[in-house]
């Protein structure tokens, strides 16, 4: 199935628009791609935060090898824009977690991150070689990871504040490269048994990834302020970082 591309809303930041297009293009060629069922009230959300309109749109798919592909684009008034995407693997497959986030405001991009995060001890060697096949851009403002992020991201994570349009373009190209490596790995992957020790370890690794991501208090505080604590918990636990199904 080929998902229908969405038209970008007026005033969307060029990097948000470019990354969303790259992500949609990358998942369009994955095997067995289909829409992932989701409560309709979580697909598109509208609220108020500090007197400004808050809108959140979610696109959710699954395919062979990946239990969930998620793209979230959020906007607060005419200022803050957020893109968040995570591809969660089926633990039966030896695949990493793809993740990318950007935060854009009137002054530009304040944060941009992309990673292929291992769910076992380390990334597969072949995957590392593919990532390293593209030279790493010389970004001028590399940011420090929060403690919870250091516990789950790989040593190939890129977390920066892009300095100008040239670095925004370089980051977009880097994300496209990570997406290509991820998509190739998904197509090539074969499943292992539920009882295999490697499968169990990947399952536990993904549980830990979700646990650490839920420690990002900034996300929870924004959602609680715009809606309420119960809704924020539901959104985070059921949509953003839901645990993988039991083996």
UniProtKB/Swiss-Prot annotation:
Gene Ontology molecular function: cobalt ion binding; phycocyanobilin:ferredoxin oxidoreductase activity
EC number: 1.3.7.5
Family: Belongs to the HY2 family.
UniProt-listed Pfam families: Fe_bilin_red (PF05996)
Entry keyword Oxidoreductase: yes
Keyword annotations from UniProtKB, A to Z: Oxidoreductase
Protein name per UniProt: Phycocyanobilin:ferredoxin oxidoreductase
Catalytically driven reaction(s): (2R,3Z)-phycocyanobilin + 4 oxidized [2Fe-2S]-[ferredoxin] = biliverdin IXalpha + 4 reduced [2Fe-2S]-[ferredoxin] + 4 H(+)
InterPro entries in the cross-refs: Ferredoxin-dep_bilin_Rdtase (IPR009249), Ferredoxin_bilin_OxRdtase (IPR022870)
């Amino acid at each position: 199935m080929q998902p229908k591309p969405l038209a970008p809303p007026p005033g969307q930041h060029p990097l948000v628009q470019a990354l969303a297009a790259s992500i949609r293009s990358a998942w369009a060629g994955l095997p067995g791609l289909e829409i992932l069922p989701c409560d309709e009230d979580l697909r598109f959300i509208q609220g108020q935060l500090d007197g400004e309109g808050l809108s959140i749109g979610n696109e959710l798919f699954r395919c062979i090898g990946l239990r969930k592909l998620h793209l979230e684009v959020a906007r607060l008034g005419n200022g803050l824009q957020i893109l968040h995407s995570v591809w969660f693997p089926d633990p039966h497959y030896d695949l990493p977690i793809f993740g990318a986030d950007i935060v854009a405001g009137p002054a530009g991009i304040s944060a941009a991150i992309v990673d292929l995060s291992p769910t076992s001890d380390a990334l597969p060697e072949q995957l590392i070689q593919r990532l390293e096949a593209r030279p790493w851009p010389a970004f001028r403002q590399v940011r420090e990871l929060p403690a919870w992020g250091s516990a789950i991201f790989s040593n190939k994570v890129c977390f920066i504040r892009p300095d100008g349009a040239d670095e925004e373009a370089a980051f977009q190209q880097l994300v496209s490269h990570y997406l290509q490596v991820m998509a190739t790995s998904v197509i090539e992957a074969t499943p292992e048994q539920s009882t295999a020790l490697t499968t169990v370890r990947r399952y536990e690794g993904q549980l830990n990834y979700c646990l650490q991501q839920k420690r990002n208090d900034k996300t929870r505080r924004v959602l609680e302020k715009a809606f309420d604590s119960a809704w924020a918990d539901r959104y985070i636990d059921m949509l953003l970082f839901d645990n993988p199904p039991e083996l």
